[in-house]
């Protein structure tokens, strides 16, 4: 199994290996601006979590639009945080490739919950702006440089 289909990411010409990223709320990857993934529950219907993630990303995009932000990036400020595999699943096809996937941290918002009720309340009613997210607005010059 290939993490995110084997896509190789880079930001401003610098490679960002997926195994070095942390999952912010299980949907954004640290260090990758404007990037979200939908990973479902391993203990319940996969689509329940994917639906919550999609709703939350739409809330985030609306927030960015209202405040004229063009970039949102998840930043891990706790470099000494203990990590573990993002997917807590013991199937052979996952176990063989788990080192290629993002990690999760040992505290919020980097800890992946496998709890639909908790996630529903958190994703639908939490504040969008927190200390782990940075928002930026690109200037015309910035945008031209990245074309």
PLM region descriptions:
Residues 1-46:
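Glycine-rich loop(s) and the adjacent beta-strand/alpha-helix scaffold that form part
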Residues 23, 34-147:
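C-terminal, flexible cofactor-proximal segment of oxidoreductases
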């Amino acid at each position: 199994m290939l993490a995110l289909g084997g896509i190789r990411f880079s930001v401003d010409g610098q490679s960002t290996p997926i195994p070095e990223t942390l999952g912010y709320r299980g949907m954004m990857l640290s260090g990758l601006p404007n990037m979200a993934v939908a990973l479902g529950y391993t203990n319940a219907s996969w689509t329940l979590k994917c639906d919550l993630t999609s709703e939350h990303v739409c809330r985030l995009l609306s927030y960015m639009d209202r405040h004229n932000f063009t970039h949102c990036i998840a930043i891990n400020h706790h470099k000494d945080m203990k990590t573990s595999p993002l997917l807590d699943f013991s199937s052979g096809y996952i176990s063989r490739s788990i080192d290629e996937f993002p990690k999760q941290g040992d505290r919020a918002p980097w800890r992946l919950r496998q709890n639909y009720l908790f996630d529903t309340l958190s994703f639908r009613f939490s504040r969008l702006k927190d200390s782990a997210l940075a928002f930026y607005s690109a200037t015309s010059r910035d945008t031209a440089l990245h074309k």
